[in-house]
């Protein structure tokens, strides 16, 4: 699964929409309130790590680095 589909799956899993997520990102983290901006970043694969952390935050997730087993 690519990052675009993974993020969209989490949005759906949380019972929300891209519009609602973008609105919350705009209020909480000062993002542009434009759904096409987020959608384009996901399509192009240009979402920054800091943006991914903020996106996870508004969806109620933490990004955790875990060492793989050998």
Question: Where on the chain are the PLM-derived regions?
Answer:
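DNA major-groove recognition helix of helix-turn-helix/homeodomain DNA-binding modules
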Residues: 49-64
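A short, Lys/Arg-rich alpha-helix, primarily the initiator
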Residues: 1-24
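Alpha-helical residues within the helix-turn-helix
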Residues: 23, 27, 57
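Recognition helix of helix-turn-helix/homeodomain-like DNA-binding domains
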Residues: 28-46
